[in-house]
Structure formats: C-alpha cells, structure tokens
Swiss-Prot record:
Source taxon at top rank: Eukaryota
InterPro entries according to UniProt: Pec_lyase, Pectin_lyas_fold, Pectin_lyase_fold/virulence, PEL
Active site residues of this protein: R253
Protein name: Probable pectin lyase F-1
Protein encoded by which gene: pelF-1
Keyword terms: Carbohydrate metabolism, Cell wall biogenesis/degradation, Disulfide bond, Glycoprotein, Lyase, Polysaccharide degradation, Secreted, Signal
Pfam family name, one: Pectate_lyase_4
Length: 388
C-alpha cells in the first residue's frame, strides 16, 4: 500500500512552492508526471494559454491570474426549458433552466448563455497546469482530456462561472478517453453542469485529491442554494482514488458512479473525504462498480448513501463495524478506517467481500488514511487553492 499523508505531500523545498507541480501523484494516478521537467512558463494571453494547453509539447503551464473567457466566443440568445427545477416554488434559491432541444415537461423561456463555457479546452498529453499562490483562475471555461490524451496534472487552480444558472451550461473538468490524470488542490464552483464528469469513453487511472467542491449557488436544481451536479463517473474502464476532498453545500451526485447504459466498469477508493452541508445525497452508486469507502466524515448530510445504491448491483464495502474494518487485514494488509456521521442520515451497512478481493489486485494503488476524527480539520486546512 502506498502512503500519501499530508506531511509527505506537503514536504517541499521553499524554492519549489508555487513554481511547479507540488508533490507527486499517488493512488491510481501514480506515475503521472504531466509536463515533467519542462521549465515553468506563464502565458501572456488567452490565445497563448489555449495554444499551450492544446499542443503536443510537454509543458508546465503556470496560471498566475484570472483568465476570463466570458464573452470571448460570444453568447447565444434562445429558448431554454423551464421545469419545476426552474420555478422552485417554496425553494430557498432560484432554480436552473435547461439548455436543451425539447421541453415536454416544462415551458419554454427566453435565455442568454455564454458560448465559451459550453466549449471546453481540449488539453493535450504531458501537461502540468499549475496555479500560482491563490491567483490561478479559469473563469467561464472548463478543461477536457479526450482523444486518448494522458499524463495530465491539474493543480491549484479555481475553475468557476460556467453559466451556473443553466443546466448543460458547461462542465469544469471532463475525462473521456483519457488516462493518468491527477486533479489536486483545486477549487470548483458556480458550474452549470458537472464539476467533474467522465464521458462514455474511459477516464482511465485518475486521482482526485485535496480539492474543494463548493456548491454554494444562487441557482440550484434542488431549489435549495446547493449545486446538484457534482461528480458523474461513468467511464468505460476507470480506476479512481478520491481522497482528502472537501465536498460541501451540494445536493446530489456527490459522487455518482457507474451506469447500466454501457459495459462500464469502475473501481473507486474513497478515503478521508469531508462531506459537509449536503441537502440531498452524497454517494450514489450504480451497477458495474466496486467501491471501497473508508475514513470519510459526513456532517449534516441528508443521505450519505442512496437507497438505490443498495439495489443497483453495485458492490460496496463501507466499513460500518470493527469486524468489517479488521476484515481488510487479510486481503489488503491493513485495517480499514471507519466512516463517521454527525447529524446525518443513515449509513446502511454493506460489506461485499468481492470489493476486498478486487482491491487486493491493486494494493500498490491503495493509499494510507488518517484517523476519521481528524478529517474535518485536516481536510478544510488543506483542500483547495493556495494551500500547497
């Protein structure tokens, strides 16, 4: 089992901080080097930024300011679909209208949305995209890794303001026919659709670590000021390490993984994440998924694990008892960490032994954990931008 504690990840020389990638990829994305030894470069214009992100050259691209794509590709005036998630009668926030071609269950309303947010930048292979201090922001534009591209690090940037008032307004990070991606120490907020989404193609080997997923919004499909579309992981053959993330003020898909619409297979190791203030559900797990969930802390989460997760055909090991924690010792070589709930809904016991059998095949990709009692303080102190 590979160890990836906060102390080892943050033990860097002063000269390295904010000058290049901080730390080393771990978990399923271990071996990801991004731009490798390429000298850090700072783009001077949006055009140069896009050119560097999309070309075939290994690069370390420093984001030292807010790159605002709003308006750079014009806007679209049209008709959006208004449903109950738009009108939000009795809700505590406005809703989201839907950018789509049909409106059988609602009424058409006039809408104007920004085009750039709906057209993500296709990131080439061998890229490190690194924010400087707390200054690195991509506004109005997401990133997509597709077409077989791989070996990408996205670290210490804030992706925000992608048509947040509209469903289908844009995704922050898309993985579709990709591999070896490390998404670390970022913040994502005010997104129209998914914070992170995989397409029908494989996302491959991915580590999502130390990120802040901030769902506070004035436009919510749940009508409660909390973003619904958090993470949708449905790729063809995917392996996820999801660790030390702060997921707060969302209302659904936090995360959703698996699908019965394809032959998708997913192994997901979720460890030491802090789920806070979730006015809906956190884990929603579908078929063809093996999920090992340990050391996660749920505070004020309505539904930590959906009921449909228990009947979908998903295989889940969620460490509900002392015995189930100790049962990890033989196949995995360590005692799993309990999950903890505070002011939250039910964490229904699931201990599918096939998950441990599957996990034993990937022992080198399983990461160490801290005590679950330390998760809220440690994660909040370290997750997000400006905390390398």
């Amino acid at each position: 089992m590979k160890t990836a504690t906060f102390s080892t990840l943050l033990a860097l020389s002063a000269s390295a901080v904010n000058a290049q990638v901080s730390g080393t990829a771990f978990g399923f994305a271990a071996g990801t080097t991004g731009g490798g030894s390429a000298a850090p470069e700072t783009p001077s214009s949006i055009d140069e930024l896009v050119e560097w992100l999309t070309d075939d050259t290994a690069r370390t691209i420093m984001i030292d300011r807010t790159w605002d794509f709003t308006g750079t590709e014009g806007t679209t005036d049209g008709q959006c679909c208004s449903t109950r998630t738009t009108t939000c009668e009795g809700g505590t926030s406005a809703g989201q209208a839907w950018i789509q071609d049909t409106c059988d269950d609602g009424t058409w309303v006039s809408c104007t949305y920004d085009n750039a947010a709906k057209n993500p930048i296709n990131v080439g292979s061998n890229k490190s995209i690194v924010g400087v201090g707390s200054d690195g922001v991509l506004k109005g534009k997401g990133l997509r890794i597709t077409g077989g591209n791989s070996n990408v690090i996205i670290q210490n940037i804030h992706i925000t303001d992608l048509n947040p008032q509209y469903v289908w307004g844009g995704d922050a990070i898309t993985l579709d026919d990709a591999d070896l991606v490390w998404i670390d120490h970022n913040k994502i907020s005010l997104i129209g659709r998914q914070f992170i989404v995989s397409g029908w193609g494989k996302a491959g080997r991915v580590t999502i670590s130390n990120n802040e997923f901030d769902g506070v919004t004035d436009w919510s499909a749940g009508c409660n000021g909390k973003h619904y579309w958090t993470l949708l992981l449905i790729g063809e053959q995917d392996f996820y390490t999801f660790s030390d993330n702060w997921v707060h003020d969302v209302s659904g898909r936090a995360p959703h993984m698996g699908t019965d619409m394809t032959e998708s297979t997913i192994f997901f190791h979720g460890v030491n994440n802090y789920f806070q203030n979730i006015g809906g559900h956190a884990f929603d797990i579908d078929t063809n998924t093996w999920a090992l969930l340990e050391g996660n802390y749920f505070e004020s989460v309505d539904t930590p694990l959906t009921e449909t997760s228990l009947t979908s055909g998903a295989l889940i090991y969620n460490v509900p008892t002392v015995d189930s924690a100790s049962a990890c010792t033989s196949p995995l070589g360590y005692i799993c960490e309990w999950n903890r709930l505070a002011g939250s809904g039910t964490w229904t016991e699931r201990t599918d032994a096939d998950v441990l059998t599957m996990a034993s095949q990937y022992i080198d990709s399983l990461i160490d954990h801290i005590p679950v009692a330390d998760v809220p303080t440690t994660v909040v102190a370290n997750a997000g931008v400006g905390k390398l």
